[in-house]
Structure formats: structure tokens, C-alpha cells
Swiss-Prot record:
Gene: kdpC
Protein name per Swiss-Prot or TrEMBL: Potassium-transporting ATPase KdpC subunit
Membrane association type: Single-pass membrane protein
Transmembrane segments: 13-35
Residue segments, region Disordered: 136-162
Family, as annotated: Belongs to the KdpC family.
Gene Ontology MF annotations: ATP binding; P-type potassium transmembrane transporter activity
Organism: Streptomyces avermitilis (strain ATCC 31267 / DSM 46492 / JCM 5070 / NBRC 14893 / NCIMB 12804 / NRRL 8165 / MA-4680)
Role, per record: Part of the high-affinity ATP-driven potassium transport (or Kdp) system, which catalyzes the hydrolysis of ATP coupled with the electrogenic transport of potassium into the cytoplasm. This subunit acts as a catalytic chaperone that increases the ATP-binding affinity of the ATP-hydrolyzing subunit KdpB by the formation of a transient KdpB/KdpC/ATP ternary complex.
Record key words, sorted: ATP-binding, Cell membrane, Ion transport, Membrane, Nucleotide-binding, Potassium, Potassium transport, Transmembrane, Transmembrane helix, Transport
InterPro entries: KdpC (IPR003820)
Primary subcellular site in the record, as a coarse category: membrane
Lineage of the organism: Bacteria, Bacillati, Actinomycetota, Actinomycetes, Kitasatosporales
Pfam families referenced in this protein's UniProt entry, alphabetically: KdpC (PF02669)
């Protein structure tokens, strides 16, 4: 009997020691080590790839933002604020009442096929809107000028980047809306165009948030 109790106590004590050791290693030491390495070597990425303006965090370089006008009475979908560069559309994501700046809870693409009537209508309507919104008194946009990313959402619906072609398409409208010359606005786009990663991965791109921060500074100094 005594041996049975002793063996049981020994096993319980061994199990408790294992629990304590594993708790310290996996619950304290390992997280601290990973956090230390992340902060030491990849501080920017570990903190969410934050973008700051005037000393304040205004967003992440990994998540797109919407630049829309306030909803008017009776409207279900806000109109784009044409003073700012616009990102890719987010068709099919819907809306949520928890986070209105980013549709994070509803991220994802639609499941509609390429020949779906609703999707075809979305693309046609989006192209017509891009042509209308970006045509100015002295610069007319043709449907053939509209790049694919201007009328299609990304896989997540939260793409922070647009193609240089789509950014270039918006230059004349941005200049007109903000009472700027075209040349400095085009220069902003050129300065914020990133090439392919490592020279061969992906496509050239423009981060919309970073571009709009630079645009805000340009407007303030003009």
C-alpha cells in the first residue's frame, strides 16, 4: 500500500515538474526569444509595417484604405473622394459595423466565375466610373486606358498597392481636384513607384497610402 502511494506521489511530482518546466519554456522563454529576434531583426514587420505621418501611425503598408466621401442620406455605397488617389475596388466584401475604415472582418474575394453576369456588370460599371471620374476638361480617358486593377478587386480585397498605370491614370484628376499642376503630381507617382521585388518577383506597384500622404504634403506646401 505504502509503495503504491509513494509511486503515485512520485509520478504526480514528475508530471508537475514537467508541466512547470514546459510552461516556463514554451509559455515564457520561447515567446520572449521569438519577440526579441523579431524586434531585433524585423522590427518594422513585427509591429505591423506601420506607416507614420506627422509622428502618428496612420495605417499599415500591407492594408489598403478607402478614400470615400461621407454617406449621403439614402446612399448605400459611399462615393470616392476624388481629391485622393483611389485603390482597387473591393466588390463583394459588403460592409460591417465593427470596423468602417478597413473591411478586415470581410476580407476575401468573391466566388463568382469569370462569366458571371453580376461580375461582368460590376466590371463594366467600374470601368465606366473610372473613365468618368478621371476625365478632366483637358484630358479624356478612354476605356482602353483603364488597367485591370482599376476594375477588379484583389484576392483579399485589401490590396494596399495599385499598378503604376492606374496611378498614372489618376494624375490629371488629382491635379484638377487639388488645383495643382500635372507635373508635380506625376513626379509624386514616379517617386512612389516600387519595382519588382529582387528585380524579378511580382510587378511594379504604388502604395496608395504612402502616395496620398505625399500628396497631402504637396497640397499643403502649394
Amino acid at each position: 500500500m505504502n509503495n503504491s502511494v509513494t509511486n503515485t506521489a512520485r509520478l504526480l511530482w514528475a508530471g508537475l515538474r514537467s508541466l512547470l518546466v514546459l510552461t516556463v519554456v514554451t509559455g515564457v522563454l520561447y515567446p520572449l526569444a521569438v519577440t526579441g529576434v523579431a524586434q531585433g531583426l524585423f522590427s518594422d514587420q513585427a509591429n505591423g509595417s506601420e506607416i507614420k505621418a506627422d509622428g502618428k501611425v496612420v495605417g499599415s503598408s500591407l492594408i489598403g484604405q478607402a478614400y470615400n466621401l461621407p454617406l449621403k442620406k439614402g446612399q448605400e455605397t459611399p462615393e470616392p473622394d476624388l481629391k485622393w488617389f483611389q485603390g482597387r475596388p473591393a466588390n463583394g466584401l459588403g460592409t460591417n459595423s465593427v470596423n468602417t475604415q478597413y473591411s478586415l472582418i470581410l476580407s476575401g474575394a468573391t466566388n463568382r466565375s469569370g462569366d458571371n453576369a453580376d461580375l461582368i456588370k460590376w466590371v463594366k460599371d467600374a470601368k465606366a466610373a473610372v473613365v468618368k471620374d478621371n476625365s478632366t476638361a483637358d484630358h479624356k480617358v478612354k476605356p482602353s486606358d483603364v488597367p485591370a486593377d482599376a476594375v477588379t478587386s484583389s484576392g483579399s480585397g485589401l490590396d494596399p498597392d495599385i499598378s503604376p498605370e492606374y496611378a498614372d491614370l489618376q494624375v490629371h484628376r488629382i491635379a484638377e481636384q487639388n488645383h495643382l499642376a500635372v507635373a508635380p503630381v506625376q513626379k509624386l507617382v514616379d517617386e512612389h513607384t516600387d519595382g519588382r521585388t529582387l528585380g524579378f518577383i511580382g510587378e511594379p506597384r504604388v502604395n496608395v497610402l504612402e502616395l496620398n500622404i505625399a500628396l497631402k504634403e504637396l497640397v499643403a506646401t502649394s
